[in-house]
């Protein structure tokens, strides 16, 4: 007999979400996640993917994955610390370290796992974390898991960070202090003020932790936000995902050799989860090699990002202050935003709405993610549909 308490909880809360329009319906794809996708037998121009460089469908990665399956099988067979570490994992980590300009790196099964692993391996209840108010959910959860005191500072407000860091330092309550920020903030596409953050950190002896999920492959000629600012030797923790620009799955922490050595013996997702599959490891390594060999995909991504931004801006849409190819189209009202996204969908443009509580009330937006794989013809068609729907709904 199943729990009546659970049944009541689920029924009431699911109904509440649905009545408020906050229940997320998942659309399964019947195609690869490229610039054109198929859902329910209909083709859409895809502006919702994190596949920034189009590498998720690249034949070179497919060949690497197939080769690894033939050699190693489909699974690693154990956790890394028993006998699940393949020579392929070591090569991947060496490639990541070279890519990120650090001494060493450690690979995890997901980007989310990285933040659950690294923060709690170093911070505890006697420490404090200074965290940007718009940091990713995995940073928030990883910080909570560590049991450290979490001190939130206003988004990219360096004076607020400085004052709160000074207060934490002078209180004498904490053994260690860490400042954590996203490299690129995914909702607005703005970039963290890393030079100022590093300056404050050096002044007050804060550990520096940058989650570059949306910066790797995009900034710094592909090497990420830290490299973009020339701070590779100044940031203690460089976190990244292998599922966005890299196009596969997994995540990593890059930094000093002694940090990586510590994470290998103290980060629980590394110790208690089976290793990344051979196919994924091989595909990730090939993807990073492609990025280090050429900036062609990186340059095309930025060209397409500028093209879409210009087209939407000229139509009169509010695209915010994005500093990256991420292009939010800010509508404001939550209901209007969701209806706008629905109408775009009907016109063959797949661009999902993002509303409260993911973003602040009154700042609902449709977030567009142009990729290196989009053609100008695809973007022109999307811009035409934006114009049609925007005028029909009185948004422009």
From Swiss-Prot:
Q: Where does substrate bind?
A: 136, 358
N6-(pyridoxal phosphate)lysine PTM positions: 244
List the CDD domains hit by this protein, alphabetically: KBL_like
Q: Which GO terms describe its biological process?
A: biosynthetic process
- Name the Pfam families for this protein: Aminotran_1_2 (PF00155)
Q: Where does pyridoxal 5'-phosphate bind?
A: 111-112, 186, 211-214, 241-244
User: What is the taxonomic lineage of the source species?
Assistant: Bacteria, Bacillati, Bacillota, Bacilli, Bacillales
Q: Which SUPFAM superfamilies match?
A: PLP-dependent transferases
Per UniProt, the keywords (alphabetical) are:
Pyridoxal phosphate, Transferase
**Please, which domain of life does this record's source organism belong to?**
Bacteria
Concerning InterPro entries, the annotation shows: Aminotrans_II_pyridoxalP_BS, Aminotransferase_I/II_large, AON_synthase_class-II, AONS_Archaea/Firmicutes, PyrdxlP-dep_Trfase, PyrdxlP-dep_Trfase_major, PyrdxlP-dep_Trfase_small
EC main class here is transferase
Cofactors named for this entry: pyridoxal 5'-phosphate
**Matches recorded under PROSITE patterns:** AA_TRANSFER_CLASS_2
Q: How does it assemble?
A: Homodimer.
Q: Say which family it is in.
A: Belongs to the class-II pyridoxal-phosphate-dependent aminotransferase family.
According to UniProt, the name of this protein is: Putative pyridoxal phosphate-dependent acyltransferase
GO MF terms listed in the record are: pyridoxal phosphate binding; transferase activity
EC number in record = 2.3.1.-
């Amino acid at each position: 007999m199943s729990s009546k308490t659970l049944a009541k909880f689920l029924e009431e809360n699911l109904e509440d979400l649905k009545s408020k329009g906050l229940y997320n319906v998942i659309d399964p794809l019947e195609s690869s996640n490229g610039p054109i996708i198929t859902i329910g037998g209909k083709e859409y121009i895809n502006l919702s993917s994190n596949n920034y460089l189009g590498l998720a469908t690249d034949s070179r990665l497919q060949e690497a994955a197939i080769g690894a399956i033939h050699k190693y099988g489909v699974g690693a067979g154990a956790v890394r610390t028993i006998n699940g570490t393949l020579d392929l994992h070591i090569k991947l980590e060496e490639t990541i370290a070279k890519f990120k300009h650090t001494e060493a790196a450690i690979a995890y099964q997901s980007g989310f796992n990285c933040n659950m692993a690294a923060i709690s391996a170093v911070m505890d209840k006697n420490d404090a974390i200074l965290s940007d108010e718009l940091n990713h959910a995995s940073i928030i959860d990883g910080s909570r898991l560590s049991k450290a005191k979490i001190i939130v500072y206003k988004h990219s407000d360096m004076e607020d960070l400085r004052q709160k860091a000074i207060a934490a330092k002078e209180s004498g309550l904490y053994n260690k202090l860490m400042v954590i920020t996203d490299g690129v903030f995914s909702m607005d596409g703005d970039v963290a003020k890393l030079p100022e953050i590093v300056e404050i950190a050096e002044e007050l002896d804060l550990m520096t932790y940058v989650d570059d999920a949306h910066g790797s492959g995009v900034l710094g000629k592909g090497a990420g936000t830290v490299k973009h600012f020339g701070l590779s030797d100044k940031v203690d923790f460089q976190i990244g995902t292998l599922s966005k620009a890299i196009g596969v799955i997994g995540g990593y922490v890059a930094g000093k050799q002694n940090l990586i050595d510590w994470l290998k013996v103290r980060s629980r997702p590394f110790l208690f989860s089976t290793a990344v599959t051979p196919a994924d490891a091989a595909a990730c390594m090939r993807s990073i090699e492609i990025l280090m060999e050429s900036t062609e995909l990186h340059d095309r991504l930025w060209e397409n990002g500028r093209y879409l931004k210009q087209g939407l801006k000229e139509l009169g849409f509010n695209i915010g202050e994005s500093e990256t190819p991420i292009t939010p189209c800010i509508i404001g009202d939550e209901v209007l935003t969701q209806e706008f996204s629905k109408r775009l969908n009907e016109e063959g443009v797949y661009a999902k709405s993002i509303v409260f509580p993911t973003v602040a009330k009154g700042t609902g937006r449709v977030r567009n993610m142009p990729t290196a794989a989009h053609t100008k013809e695809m973007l022109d068609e999307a811009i035409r549909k934006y114009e049609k729907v925007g005028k029909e709904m009185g948004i422009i």
